């Protein structure tokens, strides 16, 4: 009994903390470190601001298009009128009947966009990768090429190895 009482008195004097076992007087002198990093670099802050501004701009354009769509006609009735330009470059343009904006399918003619036959390949119009992932976008880039998969070697004849 006396041992337990002495032990309790000793514990009350020291007052250990429950997580790391340091005395309270040491913890009061030093501020605890945060469990995670709270510093954000200025470059990351600028990128976050640009991203928020871009999202806000997209939301505003969507709201404006909804307002205009409700006033004139439903969005399902919007049609694109296709017309060939008189240029010999072969670019095709689309004209939106409502907003009179022009979109070029071919984009600027570059050597990288030219196909093997000399005809330019169309550049894909893509506004937001989260909205519609495609085969050419949202690819995962690995640091190393995956290892070659080989069939296990067996001691049998080659004709027996590949029989299904």
Curated annotation (Swiss-Prot):
InterPro entries membership: CDRT4 (IPR029185)
Origin superkingdom: Eukaryota
UniProt-listed Pfam families: CDRT4
Region Disordered, residue ranges: 65-94
Protein name, per record: CMT1A duplicated region transcript 4 protein homolog
Organism field: Bos taurus
